[in-house]
Every structure is written in C-alpha cells, then in structure tokens.
C-alpha cells in the first residue's frame, strides 16, 4: 500500500484517543483470587458518533507489562477490524499502576498520558459496577478497586502569576450554546459532543479568563494541565487537573461560594455535571484562545459490608 493509499484508508476509519484502566474488580474468581481486568474506551469526539469498547480479564498471576502489552496489541487489531484507526494517545489515571501501564502503552508506540479526562471510561466503569458485576458469581459488595473520586488529599497550589490573566469571571452558558462549540474558533482546548437528551435551556457554569496580551500563552499552559473539573472548597474555586493536581483559581466571598456551589450541584442533576473553561483576549471578541468542556465526575462504590455473592 502506498503512502497516499494509507492516507485515504485512514480517512475512512473512526479516529479517537483511548481511555484505559487496568486494575482489580469487585469479583473473586473460583481460584480465590481477585479478578483483574483491562477496560478500554475510546474518547467521545466530533469525528465519530461511535464508541469503541474493549475488555479483557487478566489472570492474577500475570499482572505485568508483558501481559498488558500483548492485550493492547489484541485490542488494536480488534479495533482495526471494527473500523478504528490507531489512537495517538491513551489516557489513564490509576496511580498505583502507572509504571506497568505507561511502559505497556509506550511498547506499542502510543503516547501515554496520565489524566483524569477519561469521562467515557468513568461512565463505562460505573455501568459495569452497577449493571454487570453484581450479576456474576463471586461478586463482592464493598470496595475492592476504588474508582476515581475527587477526594484528593493534597492542598491546591495557587495558579502561577503569569497565567492568572487580567481578569476572570464566573459565568453560565446554555446547553444549546455548548452543543455548538465545534463551530467556534478555538486555538487550544478539548471539546466533545453533549448528550442530546439534556434540555437546551439548561445552564452550565464555568470560568472565563481574559488576558489582552497573553491569552494564547495562558491557553497553552492550561492545555498542558489536562483540566478535569471545577469545585468549591472552603470558599475557594479549585481546578482539578491531570492525575492529582489541584489549582487554586481564586478566593470567593462566602455568599458567592455558596451560590456557585449550588450551581455546580444543580448542574449535576440537570446537565450531567458539565462545566467549561474559556480563555479570551477580551469579553468582546468572538474567538477563543482556549476552550475546554469539563465534567464533574464523582463515582463511588457500594459501601455495604463486604459479602461474597455465590
């Protein structure tokens, strides 16, 4: 196949980054060992409406980079058969498995990115934990493999002076506006399709940053952060990012903090927890140096006493 033929062939393939988790699950196998499982999901984007999902159980005595590299190659072959191009990046967030996962991803020639911007993966894990695992023999009620929560213990670091911009505001946009984000002029950022089932008039809270002379520099820095979600803690607006980073965006008056926290809570109910960050030179330009859609993910396991189901 010539280079031009390869290019034309790739245009016919679905294109997306991948999101990955490799860890134990709340199931005890017949041999008395915890189940280990590789879970893969493609990231939602505007290139395709499809989602690639792939799972493989790993024997407890083979939890290593050799097994994972082999499994990833199997996943790539299966994805290609189903019409998917090889991903450029694979995101993962499981800190205790970082060495094995990173090595295995790099073994197959793909960039490994430690990030909690794995919203499709969180949805997939939540579905498995609620709908699939409880039906299996050996299921254990309780916490065997904690998924992501926002209870990161480290204190937030203040945003560097150079990236605070000239001004910031807390704002809201409608779901209808957010759905059209793919048509906006955006230099840096990460956006993805919004669920169609959400009412267009529902509002999404977010952070707007302005810098007349350094908006692109700010956007480039934020892009390297892998921003995950905004939250309020002790009258402070916090940005969670990357693997376990926390950034103090600004201090708020108690009244303002409560009002914004209420908006975040309401958005979780009405709009799937969507949030946004935008960076512009001024509030009046119709161009974004940076724009990110975020999602307030907070999944927890069952907290019932541990009990094996047979």
Residue ranges and their predicted role:
Residues 6-47:
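An active-site-proximal beta-strand-loop segment
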Residues 42-58:
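Electropositive, glycine- and tryptophan-enriched low-complexity nucleic-acid-binding patches
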Residues 65-88:
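Short, basic/hydrophobic alpha-helical segments
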Residues 88-101:
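Acidic, metal-coordinating catalytic cores used for nucleic-acid/nucleotide bond scission
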Residues 102-114:
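Short, surface-exposed basic-aromatic patches at helix termini and helix-loop junctions that form
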Residues 112-136:
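Long, charge-dense
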Residues 138-256:
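Long, charge-rich C-terminal accessory regions
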Residues 300-306:
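Conserved small/polar residues in nucleotide/adenosyl-binding loops
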């Amino acid at each position: 196949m010539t280079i031009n033929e390869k290019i034309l062939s790739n245009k016919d393939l679905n294109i997306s980054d991948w999101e990955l988790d490799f860890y134990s699950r709340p199931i005890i196998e017949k041999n008395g060992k915890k189940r280990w499982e590789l879970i893969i999901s493609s990231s939602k984007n505007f290139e395709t409406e499809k989602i690639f999902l792939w799972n493989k159980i790993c024997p407890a005595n083979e939890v290593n980079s050799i097994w994972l590299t082999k499994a990833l190659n199997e996943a790539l072959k299966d994805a290609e058969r189903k019409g998917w191009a090889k991903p450029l990046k694979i995101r993962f967030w499981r800190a205790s498995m970082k060495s094995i996962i990173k090595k295995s991803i790099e073994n197959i020639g793909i960039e490994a990115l430690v990030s909690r911007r794995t919203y499709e993966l969180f949805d997939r894990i939540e579905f498995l934990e609620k709908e699939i695992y409880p039906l299996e023999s050996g299921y254990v009620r309780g916490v065997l493999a904690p998924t992501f929560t926002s209870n990161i213990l480290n204190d937030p670091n203040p945003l560097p002076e150079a990236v605070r911009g000239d001004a910031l505001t807390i704002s809201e946009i409608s779901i209808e506006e957010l759905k059209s984000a793919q048509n906006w002029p955006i230099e840096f950022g990460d956006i993805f399709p919004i669920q169609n089932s959400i009412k267009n008039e529902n509002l999404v809270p977010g952070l707007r940053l302005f810098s007349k002379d350094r908006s692109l520099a700010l956007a480039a820095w934020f892009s390297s952060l892998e921003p995950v979600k905004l939250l309020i803690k002790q009258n402070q607006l916090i940005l969670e990012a990357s693997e376990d980073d926390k950034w103090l965006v600004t201090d708020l008056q108690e009244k303002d903090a409560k009002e914004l926290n209420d908006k975040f809570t309401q958005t979780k109910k009405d709009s799937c927890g969507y949030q946004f960050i935008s960076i512009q030179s001024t509030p009046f330009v119709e161009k974004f140096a940076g724009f990110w859609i975020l999602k307030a993910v907070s999944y927890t396991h069952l907290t019932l006493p541990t009990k094996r189901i047979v």
